[in-house]
Every structure is written in C-alpha cells, then in structure tokens.
Amino acid sequence: MENSQAKEQQDGVSGVPQSRLKIPAAIFTEYPVSRVWDIVEKVRVGMLTTQFSGGLRARPLEARVDRDAGVIWFVTDVRGAKDDEIGVAHDIGLAFCDDGAHVYLSITGRAFVIRDSGKAKDIWKKTDDAWFPEGSSDPNVRLLRIEPDTAELWDGPSSAAIIVFDCAKSRAA
C-alpha cells in the first residue's frame, strides 16, 4: 500500500495525485499563486458552491483576498442557508470568470463561518451597505473564511491547458 501511495504522490503535480484528478499529466503547469489572487481581485464576484442534503447549491458573493494569509473572505448573512450548509460540510467550490479575457478559475477548499466584527470592519466595502444598512456591526453579519486547497486555471483565449497547483502549500510557506 505504501508503494502505491508513494507512486501516486510521485505521479501527481503539486501534491495532487493524478489518479484523483483523472487528468493527463502533460497538461499540468505550475503557476504562481499570485496569479490566482490577481484574478480573484480583478473579477471580485465568484460563485460559491456548497453542499446540502439535496445536492449542491451555488450563489454569487464578492471576494476579498488576504494574500498574506492565503485565504479568501466573503461577507455573508447569518440568516442565509449557506452558513448552515458550511457548518455541516466545509468542502466548497468557487468559480471566477473573466469572459472578456478568456480566464476561468475554479478553486476548491474549505469554508468556515466566523463572527468577528473587527475583521468585518477591516474588509468592509461600500457595496456591503446595500445588504447591511447598519454596517459591519449589524448582528446578522458573518464572514466566510475560505482556505483554498487547489486551483485550476484556464488562462487566455487559446488555453486548452488546465493549470493546477496546491494553494495549501503556499499558505504553509
């Protein structure tokens, strides 16, 4: 068993075993994690997919990147279903698309619902006022902390390649 695990890791790119991804190794390329953050910051709104008892559910949210911590933050409402869904199943998916530049980004990772009025104030944007007229101190404000594990990137109009790398490694570095 150890030999097959070692072989799987050896064959994988950025610590992601090929056998799990089921994508030929020839299409993998390393990209700097900064490219992921650049795309998220430019696109801003991503589709967050969570799990619930009936399957998957996606909704748009405005992202805030914390490059130093290697995480993505979202401001959310405690009254929404996503907080309950994340409380049960932390695994999530994020999708960002810049159609004009032909850039498509898919991120998988883990999400955590956090109540932290200080952090909410730090990352608050004017657009959040539309959802929370009382501002960052609104008692319904919650934060989603997304810890990305893997990012897949289709970058540019002629890109047939999927660029995969391990965000968790960059967070630990």
Regions flagged by a language model, labelled:
Residues 2-28, 107-173:
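Charged, gly/pro-rich active-site loop segments
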Residues 24-27, 51-53, 71-73:
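Short, flexible loop segments at the rims of nucleotide/cofactor-binding pockets, characterized by
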Residues 31-33, 79-82, 125-129:
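Charged, amphipathic alpha-helical segments
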Residues 37-53, 91-96:
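A short, Trp-centered hydrophobic/proline-enriched beta-strand micro-motif
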Residues 47, 71-73, 152:
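General beta-strand recognition
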Residues 53-56, 101-103, 154:
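Short glycine/serine/proline-enriched coil/turn segments at secondary-structure junctions
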Residues 58-60:
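Positively charged, polar, low-complexity stretches
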Residues 64-102:
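A short mixed-secondary-structure module that forms the rim of ligand-binding clefts
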